[in-house]
Amino acid sequence: MENVVIIDAVRTPMGRSKGGAFRHVRAEDLSAHLMRAVISRNPGLNAAEIDDIYWGCVQQTLEQGFNIARNASLLAEIPHSVPAVTVNRLCGSSMQALHDGARAIMVGDAKISLIGGVEHMGHVPMNHGVDFHPGMGRTVAKAAGMMGLTAEMLAKIHNISRQSQDEFAFRSHQRAYAATQAGHFAKEIVATNGHDAEGVLKRFDFDEVIRPETNLSGLAALRPAFDPVNGTVTAGTSSALSDGASAMLIMSESRAKSLGLTPRARIRSMAVVGCDPSIMGYGPVPASQLALKRAGLELADIGLFELNEAFAAQSLACLKGLGLLESMDDKVNLNGGAIALGHPLGCSGARISTTLLNLMERRDVQFGLATMCIGLGQGIATVFERL
């Protein structure tokens, strides 16, 4: 079986969904911009040799409909002979795109895949047009379709206090802002056109979503967002609504060598699991355990972790389940997470993988693990080995 290596990994800045930088920029344009960037950054690559494009997107309607992967590739002027498919595993969509592209290479059906994902949550809200089957309530709790209430459930089951959630959210903003100030995101962000508050066209090279002014007293003053009577989960301890795209260039190790391209990491293992929809946020625990088993590694072998950070309660429950609470500040989401950066659904899997790869290089770490919870009860994980 072919080894799959990561050649490049980039993303757009994360823009606020409500009146943010990308309010006048379409999802296809964000995607096409990154596709072009990946190709231009790797002059040894002939775009016509890409075997397939796998692009994650959850709300596949309006501007994100009718196979946005293909629409974006046409806008990017990638040769018409290169096919493209849009992938949907909800929050894990672009990580699933990575898995799909990698698997095609592993079995010999492809040599080069361009993968990534996008979500413009400002233009296409996450609940747009959603119509759950009324009979679902016979097999699944109705609240399982409300992500905030599943986070409340995890908080209750795992005794995650309101204070610890506020502290985790504060940490996310602090770390993301510190990473921005130190230039740690510069290697992964591709400057992208947007519009400032006055509507003036501007080139953005920073994440608009981070709130450096966040403090514990402000977080403590927020009301529960999902369970107004007994809840502990607030808007401040939930991932921000944002717009963005991410992309990765992957290929077989042999093709990278023949093209003279330097691999940054290899995919050591991949895993996806199901779990109870009522505690969908716990999916990263069994997914990570399965990925580690397939990689032949132990938790202690992993130097860095990236968790999608849908909610502080969800993240803390997973860290508790994996036994990572004590080492969190040394190993987990060191540049902050989705509470500060936002969680554009179809973009997030490749985004956290991109951030992880850069952290692994900066800290000289051999193994890293990226993992995500997925709405309605799934988890996905990928183990990377730095080269």
UniProtKB/Swiss-Prot annotation:
Q: Which family does it belong to?
A: Belongs to the thiolase-like superfamily. Thiolase family.
Q: Which organism is it from?
A: Yersinia pestis
The answer to whether UniProt assigns keyword Transit peptide to this entry is: no
Listed under GO biological process in this entry are: fatty acid beta-oxidation; phenylacetate catabolic process
What this protein catalyses is: an acyl-CoA + acetyl-CoA = a 3-oxoacyl-CoA + CoA
Quote the gene name from the UniProt entry: fadA
Q: Which UniProt keywords apply?
A: Acyltransferase, Cytoplasm, Fatty acid metabolism, Lipid degradation, Lipid metabolism, Transferase
Per the UniProt entry, the signal peptide is none
Principal location:
cytoplasm
Cellular location of this protein? Cytoplasm
This protein is called 3-ketoacyl-CoA thiolase
Q: Which GO terms describe its cellular component?
A: cytoplasm
Q: Answer yes or no on keyword Magnesium.
A: no
